[in-house]
From Swiss-Prot:
Catalytic center residues: 565 (for beta-ketoacyl synthase activity), 700 (for beta-ketoacyl synthase activity), 743 (for beta-ketoacyl synthase activity), 1354 (proton acceptor), 1543 (proton donor)
The protein's name: Non-reducing polyketide synthase nscA
Species per Swiss-Prot/TrEMBL record: Arthroderma benhamiae (strain ATCC MYA-4681 / CBS 112371) (Trichophyton mentagrophytes)
PROSITE patterns: CARRIER, KS3_1, KS3_2, PKS_MFAS_DH
The enzyme's E.C. designation: 2.3.1.-
Polar residues biased stretches: 444-453
Domain Ketosynthase family 3 (KS3): from-to ranges: 392-825
Length: 1798
């Protein structure tokens, strides 16, 4: 290098004037070019360090940083916004300058030219940190490494400065930025200092918050301090007020403040940095101090950073000294020196000043001064980019879940299946398709399968729709693969302990999903039979992944891949690639396959893929194809370093994953050994692994001749070559899971991976069961010599000491793709051994339904019974910090496992458990912090928190350092309890309490508690004001400390006392005034704590006299342990001085409301908060009770508000509970209790109240000591959502190629043989009978003479209308038939027909020769002794069944003995009422009606045929009646119980409603929508005599509805009962509209054909309540009420009339306002209609639509919102926007809107 050359590199404290985003973008682009290798390394290291530093931030700060993959991701964040502004600005400036520096050298491709002695470094403020990295470097590669550490220090410095500064003055609550520094020009440093000194003196400014000089030169002075004080200083000083000054862009706090920072502050920033550079690296280049202008004297990196830290925090900047130092360096040492250079990053005022000074120095000399801009290179074009390769991390699989054949619904069951060597082969179950019609071994029948075999998962339709916010309708239409993908994804995440957002790697924006799927059976077959709203989102593949991302709110990528049979493992490989590429930080991957479509069976069979003989016979000589299988599997994958940092359980490590294609195969479906071997080599090379070291391979192994031969060749050649040969101890074991569970196609690869992971877990290779006869001769003969072979028995696979086992998983696609995964053992985890001193632990469980919560509790109890040695700490960690939490919650704090077991058993044994559990509210309750006064003080308060939690400890220490800098004693010994247990001074007592409370408030914020308001009691009000941002923490400490000093100086300790009295203030006054000896005693009211608790103060003698007097009246009194009588005249001597001190303190508007005990109001602005307020608060009464009442009156406090007592002991919590008995009040600390236990209990209480604490922060200090337990998985509240494939249409479509056959009208054949035929049930169309379940489908024609005659026996408006007795007979007929099928030897079958609900009346058509079919579907479950029934209309031409039922009911098979006992107790009461009616009739007080008169009255609504007229006489008294009944002797057909007999004994209720004077029968008629039950103790007898009795009454929940019980007596005995039969009032003007014959017999909408139905009834009783699938009403052919009328009038009862829920007909009469008035509108009827419509469309029960139910939870998404808004318009005449479901997110808000606007 030229000896005449000198250089200065200057690092500025300002960003270049260029567009910052563009600068960083250009840096990022260049870093991707291999020519900028060191720049890339520096940016990568800086990114890693920033991620590490962000991960260590307290949660509230951590959440401010968006997820970022590189520093470029942070550029869009406004540096200056929020509490991390200083940290972000400092670190980004350091990154930018060092990146530009490194890039400059790499762009020039020049050697390092900074030579000690010839080059010097200089900088200002943060720029010095960047310069330090260069000073520590001997080459450019050193800068990249040291620079990243400089970034760490700059970030930490910014965080620390902002934190300390916020304690001096809180940021503006409205986010307005205020400058902490102003520059003054044309004034000397001395004159400015004089003005500042005068201001600080005059305003009594505390030392810490004084205004000071932070920088100076000959032309300007920088003034720094809290923004409000700078403003006050410039207003106070006339000189400064009129000076030339400007605010500097310094928005985040104070540096260069020697009065503020100490060496301990510097050490906490520098010495705590995890640096591998700082300890031993030497300083290579001189770096000038910005204070002295001389080089720092440090010799090592650690010394240099400490010096720089000291200068940045405490040193004043003197620009003149910097300039002088630079000039000195450039000063010529000899005449030969001629070339000087200044390198910089653009220019600035400071740099121009330096440049001018140097030029002035060399003026007249022959010296050359040049400037080099280190920014210019970044904008150059370097030609085409030369990409760099991405480094690969190892990946960790941390969670897995499955649904696999053979009942393997979890991993334990899957392993048991493998370990036992079980084969899950079975025939196709009838719930998939009917083998009787779709299986033809000859293959002659078109579209049939030639094999009946497969491997199937259990209960594929079972799903917890409510958990995943899906409506039953959406769930039913959604592909079971997609549903189970959701389920297994959740279970895998649960196993992995993933809580989205808990760590940087699990931020929702960094999680992606990758699933393999190769078929669409459900969409193409099952759901396509009746295409609905959810056909696309429920069936299209992309929605499978999309639904996972949407439910969990993951915004990473979602990919659905199809690579045929390798789809599952290819999805895993894609996930690995995304992790290696940095696209995601966590990936969920898996494979999906659920078989339902016989077409795929046929296609695969015809292509000779499938075995006709059974299971996959892997490597067997008779291998003849594969056997199909279901399968669902999910795994969770992270980068290994992230998994270790997150304290995850690592199942195995992925070293490599590759996919290629068999392009050279002889056909597209034929495997190719060369391609497979090439893929193995690629994955081995990717990981740098010797193939000989692999000891287990999970084969693709399908059991095909070609596949087995090729794979055995490729595997043996690569992993067990002839040479080098494997040693005897290097046995290579092979396995193939398809021999157990078949070929899961898209799920095959994930099943193989799951098996391999279990092999790692269990250290055992399960036996191979694929060879049924002998090994396939196509397999290489020398495998044994190569030391490779199948594990034919369960073979131990131990982990070698100090080594890791390697395994390979293969999965090949039929299209030619080959995917291979290379695994190794997880790192051996060394659990940190700590001293577990937490006394209690919080154990939590949650669910989204009561049943699931109860089941989760049962599972945990069972687990603990099985593993009683479980670590309670690990259990608490797992159930709280590592679980996603839901709205049904259980939580407890316990000290031992046995205590937890006791609590669980107690809860589970509670018979009222289900009713007592309530979901937490959707809206998070507000939380108010209540700060106690000094009366709660004791030594050691918060000691355990201080010792355990670094964040809490740091807060206390920072506040304590501030107190010490203000001249007060340290409070740390009080908290540590290292002080002598003697009375403390008021200063120490009061400062300790306030510092503790401020630190506790911040700790609660760290734990995730969002504060809504604060209240302080006495001294606690200072902490409250500080937390609310009214005053800074420093000012709070200063005022409290000085206040305490004034009290010590001016007030006599022990002369006064305070007395707590259990009585209100006025009562105390009256009691004292009533006695002469106490009437004149002087005292003052210090505190009104509650309406019954008062604290008074005064002189000791007088207070003692009062105490004795009040105790004599049995009033509880307590002398408080305080040295002064606060809030009394004793405080008068300090008030003036306290107010003067407070006037120097800036007061700001509160960031959260302040509840004021002084003013008894809630304060929202700064007007009332000032020095006078603190004066009055010191002297006047603390009216805590009035303040609470005011907060209630102003709506800030309600019954759900949560209170947290912030202080040493929960005094305020007790006061709040006294004022609000229902209040939830928690503690922060408690005297004589471990403070961690107190916090733990309070966190549980908050959790149960609906707050979501940040449990991760609670466990963070010791997370390495805890283990994530593998607990039982979530217990789902499942219901079977299954659409069976109905009919044979996959077969029938084959005939289309021969031409469409002519269609013929549908008819119900009465000549076709049927095992069940009656007058109403005509033909069985489908029947399945199993061990405990049975299913029956029947079809009937309402136009059949027997059926039609039964209908015409009950006419309304001259139309035959099916009466409820018809549905009763059909139900009893089918019920007895099916019951006897399961229990054939039953003598008598006693049935209780319950829950009868008819949504649409059935009116007989008057078209002669027409067909009017209806379908009855029944499902019987013997385990619950119940049967569900649903009636459907069917198309009169095609026979197609409607998708939705018009009626439903249940039958319960019961013991008649219980009925007899029940009715025997009631019989005398019923007989008594009958006798009363007879007596009243004889007295003329009740009406006795003859048969003709009774039925004449009935004819007002219903005209009964003669056979239905069984009532001989009736006694009617308003709504009560009895009848004498004689049944006609003729049955008139084939029935179980003739409808005309049923009607005769029960229709007395209808006569009461439609014939009594108590009803307005002129304007209204009454129809019945159903009943709760119908029972007959014995069969009705022909010609027998009965009596009926009923008393109807209005139902309180609906003014248009009446109900009552009809009793049927034979002799003196009750022999039957219709329980709670209901009648609805309907305007008579609607008679024509509701009861007119249908004009068509067709059913709208495509529906599945009826013929050939085969359905398996699933027993769901053990997992969920028996509940028929809810089906909405369909549009019937008969006319219905218009939409206008539907919205104005009560809807008619649907049993006998069409419900207003039906669609509006095309032509509807206009309803005039007068008609609307006559309809007697009822406000809540519109609400009822709306709710029923929503229930119908979503498939939910109306009962589920509670006021607090949210539409999101009910599964109402944007698509359903559109559907509902359209239905509201067309059916109810209500115009709403679909967005209303977002604007009114709950049912209650929606109904309120409807009431208001509709």
């Amino acid at each position: 290098m030229d000896s005449t050359f000198r250089r200065v590199v200057f690092f500025s404290n300002e960003f270049p004037s260029d567009d910052l985003k563009e600068l960083f973008r250009r840096l990022d682009q260049h870093s991707k070019d291999r020519r900028f290798r060191l720049l890339s390394i520096f940016l990568e290291e800086s990114t890693a360090i920033l991620k590490d530093e962000v991960s260590k931030l307290p949660r509230p700060l951590k959440e401010l940083v968006p997820p970022f993959g590189s520093v470029l991701g942070l550029v869009d964040v406004d540096f200056r916004q929020g509490p991390l502004g200083a940290a972000m600005e400092s670190s980004m400036l350091t990154i930018l300058e060092l990146g530009l520096f490194i890039g400059h050298y790499e762009s020039e491709d020049t050697e390092w030219d900074l030579v000690p002695g010839e080059s010097v470094l200089a900088g200002l403020s943060i720029g010095i940190l960047a310069a330090a990295a260069v000073a520590l470097s001997s080459g450019l590669s050193d800068v990249a490494k040291a620079g990243a550490e400089a970034v760490r220090v700059s970030f930490r410095l910014g965080v620390y400065v902002a934190d300390i500064s916020a304690k001096l003055e809180a940021p503006q609550s409205d986010g307005t930025l205020s400058s902490w520094a102003h520059v003054v020009t044309e004034m000397t440093e001395a004159s400015v200092q004089d003005e500042l000194k005068q201001f600080n003196t005059d305003t009594h400014s505390p030392e810490l918050t004084k205004v000071f000089i932070s920088a100076a030169d000959k032309t300007s002075v920088s003034v720094s301090g809290p923004p409000s004080r700078i403003k006050a200083a410039f207003q106070h000083s006339p000189v400064l007020r009129y000076s030339k000054s400007l605010p500097l862009p310094v928005y985040d706090g104070l540096c260069h403040a020697s009065h503020l920072y100490t060496q301990s502050d510097i050490d906490s920033i520098i010495n705590s940095a995890e640096s591998v550079i700082l300890p031993d690296r030497s300083v290579r280049l001189a770096l000038l101090s910005s204070k002295t202008g001389k080089p720092f004297i440090a010799k090592t990196a650690s010394e240099l950073f400490l010096e720089i830290g000291t200068e940045l925090l405490t040193g004043t900047i003197y620009l003149d000294n910097v300039t002088a130092g630079i000039v000195r360096h450039l000063q010529p040492q000899s005449k030969e020196m001629s070339s000087w250079q200044i390198d910089s990053f653009r220019t600035s005022l400071v740099l121009r000043s330096i440049h001018s000074a140097v030029e002035a120095k060399i003026s007249g000399e022959q010296r050359q001064l040049t400037r080099r801009d280190l920014v210019n290179w970044v904008n150059k074009d370097f030609g085409p980019r030369r990409p760099r390769s991405h480094a690969s991390s190892k990946l960790a699989i941390v969670g897995m879940a499955c649904r696999l054949p053979g009942g393997a619904n979890d991993l334990d069951l899957f392993w048991k299946l493998l370990e036992e060597g079980r084969d899950t082969l079975t025939t196709v179950p009838p719930d998939r398709f009917d083998l009787n019609t779709h299986y033809d071994p000859t293959g002659k029948t078109e579209n049939t399968t030639q094999t009946p075999y497969g491997n199937f998962i259990d209960r594929p339709g079972f799903f917890d729709a409510g958990f995943f916010n899906m409506s039953p309708r959406e769930a039913e239409q959604t592909d079971p693969m997609q549903r189970l993908a959701l389920v297994t994804a959740y279970e895998a995440l649960e196993m992995a302990g993933v809580v989205p957002g808990r760590t940087p790697s699990t931020h929702p924006s960094r999680i992606g999903t990758f699933y393999g799927q190769a078929s669409d059976d459900w969409r193409e077959l099952n759901a396509s039979q009746n295409i609905s709203t959810y056909a696309v989102p429920g069936g299209e593949r992309a929605f499978g992944n999309g639904r996972i991302n949407y439910f969990f709110k993951f915004s990473g990528p979602s990919f659905n891949l199809d690579t045929a049979c390798s789809s599952g493992l290819a999805a895993v490989q894609a996930a690995c690639s995304a992790l290696w590429a940095g696209e995601v930080d966590t990936a969920i991957a898996g494979g999906l396959n659920v078989i339902t479509d016989p077409d795929n069976y046929c296609g695969l069979g015809n292509a000779h893929f499938l075995s006709k003989t059974g299971q996959c016979k892997v490597w067997d000589k008779d291998a003849d194809g594969y056997c199909r299988a279901d399968g669902i599997g999910s795994v969770v994958i992270k980068r290994l370093e992230d998994a270790e940092a997150d304290n995850d359980n690592i199942l195995a490590v992925v070293l490599g994953a590759c996919t290629n294609h068999s392009a050279e195969a002889i056909s597209i479906t034929h495997p190719h050994a060369g391609a497979q071997k090439a893929n193995y080599r690629q994955v081995l090379n990717q990981a740098g692994v010797n193939p000989i070291d692999v000891s287990y391979i999970e084969l693709h192994g399908t059991g095909t001749q070609a596949g087995d031969a090729v794979e055995s060749e490729s595997v043996s050649d690569i992993f067990a070559p002839v040479t080098p040969r494997r040693r005897p101890d290097q046995r290579l074991y092979l396995g193939a899971v398809k021999s157990n569970i078949g070929h899961g196609e898209a799920a095959a690869g994930i099943a193989s991976l799951l098996k391999a992971l279990l092999v790692y877990q269990k250290n055992l290779i399960p036996m191979h069961i694929g060879i049924k006869s002998e090994i396939n001769p196509t397999i290489p003969k020398d495998l044994e010599r190569r030391n490779v072979g199948l594990a034919m028995q369960n073979t131990p696979w131990p982990r070698p000491a100090g080594k890791k086992r390697l395994a390979v998983v293969n999965s090949f696609g039929a299209h030619g793709g080959n995917t291979t995964l290379l695994l190794e053992d997880a790192p051996e985890r060394v659990k940190i051994q700590g001293t577990e001193d937490r006394i209690t632990h919080s154990v939590l469980l949650s669910a989204k339904s009561k049943k699931s919560l109860q089941a989760n509790m049962e599972s945990l109890l069972s687990y603990l019974d099985q593993y009683p040695e479980t670590s309670l700490a690990d259990l608490a960690y797992t159930t709280s910090s590592r679980r996603m939490h839901h709205n049904m919650r259980f939580g407890t704090s316990v000290s031992c496992i046995s205590g937890l077991q006791k609590v669980l058993r107690s809860q589970l044994d509670n018979p009222n458990f289900a009713s007592e559990v309530r979901p937490v509210p959707n809206e998070v309750p507000s939380v108010i912090l209540a700060f106690t006064g000094q009366g709660a003080y004791y030594h050691g308060m918060g000691r355990e928190l201080f010792a355990e939690f670094p964040y809490f400890r740091a807060q206390v220490q920072q506040l304590d350092r501030l107190a010490q800098r203000l001249g007060f004693p340290s409070v740390v010994p009080v908290i540590e309890n290292s002080i002598e247990d003697t009375p403390s001074s008021p200063i120490l007592t009061q400062l300790s309490v306030v510092i503790l409370e401020i630190a506790l408030a911040r700790f609660w914020s760290l734990l995730g508690v969002s504060i809504s308001a604060v209240i302080g009691h006495s001294l606690g009000e200072y902490a409250a004001l500080a937390v609310a941002g009214v005053i800074s923490a420093t000012d709070a400490i200063y005022l409290v400390g000085r206040r305490a000093q004034l009290i010590e100086e001016r007030c006599a300790q022990g002369s006064h006392s305070m007395l707590s009295v259990r009585a209100p203030e006025d009562a105390i006054q009256k009691m004292l005034a009533a006695e002469p000896e106490t009437a004149s005693i002087a005292y003052e009211v210090s505190c009104c704590n509650t309406n019954q608790d008062t604290v008074i103060g005064g002189l000791n003698g007088e207070i003692n006299d009062i105490r004795r007097a009040l105790e004599a009246k049995s009033i509880k009194c307590t002398i408080l342990d305080v040295p002064y009588a606060f809030h009394t005249a004793q405080m008068n001597p300090i008030l003036d001085d306290l107010e003067a001190l407070a006037k120097a303190v800036p007061f700001k508007a509160p960031s959260i409301p302040v509840i004021s005990p002084l003013l008894a109001t809630v304060i929202y602005d700064v007007k009332s908060l000032n020095a006078d307020y603190l004066r009055r608060a010191t002297r006047e009464t603390v009216d805590f009770a009035a303040a609470i009442e005011a907060a209630q009156d102003m709506g800030l406090v309600d019954s759900k508000t949560i209170w947290i007592d912030v202080g040493p002991h929960p005094i305020c919590a007790g006061l709040v509970r006294s004022m609000i008995p229902s209040a939830s009040a928690m503690s922060s600390c408690r005297r004589n209790e471990d403070s961690i236990s107190t916090i733990s209990k309070s966190l549980v209480a908050l959790y149960l109240a609906g707050i979501n604490p940040c449990w991760a922060e609670f466990f963070k200090p010791r997370e390495g000591e805890y283990s994530l337990l593998h607990l039982p998985k979530y217990r789902w509240n499942e219901i079977d959502y299954w659409i069976p494939y109905i009919g044979t249409w996959t077969l029938d479509k084959a005939h289309l190629k021969h031409g469409t056959k002519p269609t013929t009208p549908f008819s119900v054949s009465m000549s076709r043989p049927s095992a069940l035929r009656t007058s109403l049930v005509h033909q069985i169309t489908a029947e399945t009978v199993e061990a405990t379940t049975a299913m029956l489908h029947t079809i009937s024609d309402m136009q059949h003479p027997d059926f039609l005659e039964a209908i015409h026996g009950h006419t309304m408006n001259k139309c035959g209308v099916a009466t409820s007795s018809i549905w009763s007979d059909m139900a009893f007929t089918v019920g007895e038939y099916l019951y006897r099928r399961l229990v054939p030897n039953t003598k008598d079958v006693h049935m209780n027909l319950t829950d009868v609900e008819v949504l649409h009346a059935q009116v007989a058509s008057k078209t002669k020769g027409s067909v009017q079919p209806l379908v009855l579907r029944a499902h019987l479950n013997l385990s619950t002794n119940s049967m569900s029934l649903s009636w459907f209309n069917a198309d009169g031409e095609t026979g197609e069944c409607a998708a939705e039922s018009f009626a439903s009911a249940m039958i319960r098979f019961e013991d008649p003995v219980a009925w007899r006992k029940e009715w025997a107790r009631l019989a005398h009461l019923v007989r008594g009422r009958i006798e009363v009616l007879e007596q009243r009739a004889s007295e003329g007080k009740a009406s006795r009606l003859s048969k003709p008169l009774a039925y004449a009255l009935f004819k007002n609504v219903v005209d009964y045929a003669d056979r239905y007229r069984g009532m001989d006489s009736v006694v009617l008294d308003e709504l009560e009646a009895m009848a004498e009944v004689t049944l006609v002797p003729e049955r008139y057909g084939t029935w179980h119980t003739p409808p005309h007999w049923i009607d005769s004994v029960s229709h007395l209720a209808g006569l009461v409603m439609n014939g009594s004077d108590a009803s307005n029968t002129r304007d209204y008629f009454f129809v019945t929508p159903g009943c709760d039950s119908f029972r007959l103790l014995k069969k009705l007898e022909p010609g027998a005599r009965y009596r009926s009795y009923v008393r109807m009454f209005p139902l309180p929940e609906d003014p248009n509805m009446h109900g009552g019980d009809v009793y049927i007596l034979q002799g003196e005995e009750i022999v039957g009962m219709v329980g709670m039969i209901r009648f609805r009032r309907v305007p008579r003007l609607l008679m024509d509209r509701f009861f007119s014959p249908p004009t068509t017999t067709s059913v709208p909408g495509p529906v599945p054909p009826l013929a050939g139905v085969t359905m398996k009834y699933h027993d769901i009783a053990q997992t969920a309540p028996v509940r028929p699938t809810p089906t909405p009403p369909i549009v019937l052919p008969n006319p219905v009420v218009s939409s206008t009328m539907a919205s104005k009038a009560p809807e008619p009862a649907p049993l006998l009339a069409t419900s207003s829920e039906s669609s509006t007909p095309k032509e509807s009469p206009i309803v005039t306002p007068a008609e609307s008035e006559r309809a007697d509108p009822v406000d809540n009827n519109m609400i009822s209609q709306c709710l029923r419509l929503m229930a119908r469309e979503t498939g939910l029960e109306v009962e589920a639509l509670t006021a607090d139910a949210s539409f999101v939870q009910l599964g109402v998404d944007s698509l359903m919102s559109l559907v509902l808004s359209e239905k509201f318009r067309t059916e109810l005449g209500v115009e709403i926007k679909s967005s209303l479901f977002l604007e009114c997110p709950t049912i209650g808000e929606m109904t309120a809107w409807i009431e208001e606007y509709c």
